[in-house]
Amino acid sequence: MSFSAQHIKSARLHLRKCDPKLAAIIKAVGPFTAKAKRDRFGTLVRSIVSQQISTKAAASIRGRLEEAIRESRKTEPQRGKPYCPETILNFSIDELRAIGLSRQKATYTQSLAQHVVDGDVDLSKINKLDDEAIIESLIQVKGIGRWTAQMFLIFSLARLDILPVDDLGIKTAVRNVYGLDELPDKTEMEEIAEPWRPYASIASWYMWRSLELDQ
């Protein structure tokens, strides 16, 4: 799955027409460059590892985890995917902690792997479900909440109309762009974003990128 050139073109045209403030952001940021990641299991593992820590710390831990996986699979073909559920389950909780994961994140990562191995979460067919059904399927796994599921929908399945109303970055961007005194609540976010539909994912990406314009 990926964002098609036609979808991106239609989204940018729609968003520029429906929202003058967003149109200015689109002009300042430039082309939409997000790419959907094909490694679905790996995307979810990376999301769990990255929760509530800095970008730099998350990248360091992910690098160590991927190196440990490669070391454990030297005799196996990599096929471009460092993550697979069976390999994650071969590590003990203590081994994952030694790599840098907290006990909680190590448990969450193995829980995800077990759900995939058992077939409770079928990542090979999950794209056939609608957005809300995918969210419900994923949040049954400890460590995966609605936000993580929404990030998966956008950045792995390239779903076009996802609005992460609880994302701090988007809320901060909306406050800045629309001149609000405080961070918007869920109702305010949905009201502001209503014109963005059916391209809320594209608009959300531009909101995230708008934060870089102020740096």
Kindly give the residue locations of the regions a language model identified.
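N-terminal alpha-helical segment
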Residues: 41-45, 88-92, 130-134, 170, ...
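Short secondary-structure junction/hinge motifs that connect adjacent elements
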Residues: 24-42, 79-80
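Generic alpha-helical structural context detector
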Residues: 46, 63-67, 110-114, 154, ...
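C-terminal accessory module of base-excision DNA glycosylases/AP lyases that mediates lesion recognition
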Residues: 1-32, 132, 146-215
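Structural motif
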Residues: 34-42, 100-104, 193-200
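Alpha-helical ds-nucleic-acid-binding substructure associated with the helix-hairpin-helix region
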Residues: 25, 53-54, 58-140, 197
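Short, aromatic/basic-rich helix-turn unit that serves as a nucleic-acid recognition element
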Residues: 44-48, 52
